[in-house]
Structures are given as C-alpha cells and as structure tokens.
Amino acid sequence: MNIGMVGTGSIAHTMAKEFARLTTMPVVAVYSRSADTGVAMANEFHIPKVYTEYDEMLADPEVELVYIATPNSLHFEQAKAALLAGKHVLCEKPIVPTVAQLDELLSLAEERRLHLLEAITTIDHPNYGLAKLFAKEIGSIKTVSCTFCQYSSRYDAFMNGQTPPVFDPAYCGGALM
C-alpha cells in the first residue's frame, strides 16, 4: 500500500523514518503548503512526488493511504477529503475534536470500505512488555489501569504567557484538549 504524507513537521519526519523501514508500504508522495519544505522532505526521505495542492495528491491513483500529520484543527477536513477520494487514512492524534466529526468519518470509511486509524503508539510502549512479564508473577490479570504522560517543553512556553498551538482551542489543542 502506497503512502501519501500530509505535513512536514517534526512528527511527520519521525514517521517518515519509520515508514522508510517498511518494504511493502513506500511513501510515494508528500503534501506541503510550502514547496520548499515539501521538496526538502522529499529529498531527505527519497519521496518521488511533492504536492502543494492537497486535492492533487488525493487525485494521484498511486496514493492509497494518506498519513495526516498537520495541526489538529485540519484533521477533520483532510481526513474527510481523503476518504471521499477513496483513500485509507492514518491520522495523528487526536484524530478529531468532536464525537460528531468522528462519527461522520467512521460512517464515510464504513460506506466506502476504507480503513480509518488514529496514529497512537501506546500498544508498542515498553510498559506493556513489563505488564506481561509481571503477569507471570502475579497471576491472571482482571483489570489494568494505566496513566501515560510526557513532559512537553511547550508547557514552559505556556507558563511564560505564550499560547503554543497545543494549548490553543482554535487549533483544537493537543491530545488532552
């Protein structure tokens, strides 16, 4: 399955490194509003096509799955457009800010028999391996409660009076908003 990447920020770079390890899922296109950042990412990760118009990338028959790594406020419209174009969608978290938007995307995906996934990696987190290891010692597990948190330098900016997008409701904030 061929991947078209949407966005060229830090998380997109992290994922591009991971996608490069997949032999059966090459990244064949990248979309960026800026031709310069799109070309830079394409050169860094050997991505053959760069688009500065999202609809043009969606019209590319070679793109089968769209990976969305843009500000959260863009996720709904970009995911919806991809589904309407017949593409599978892998979207960074939070996928959308409201249940109504999620329901709409899920309905579209189901109607078109497409996959809609949120990119969350906690299933591969080392803590799950520890839980499995300790299960042998403590016996059958009935319930597990986990808390996952990570310090963000953007919190420092927020505490200094700035409003990074992750704390800005206009951008649908971060995963906690």
What are these regions (language model features)?
Residues 1-45:
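N-terminal Rossmann-like dinucleotide-binding module
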Residues 2, 25-29, 64-66, 116, ...:
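Short active-site oxyanion
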Residues 21, 84-86, 111:
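Residues at the C-terminal ends
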Residues 104-121, 140-144:
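Rossmann-fold dehydrogenase core element
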Residues 14, 40, 56, 65, ...:
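Alpha-helical elements of Rossmann-like donor-binding domains used by nucleotide-donor carbohydrate transfer enzymes
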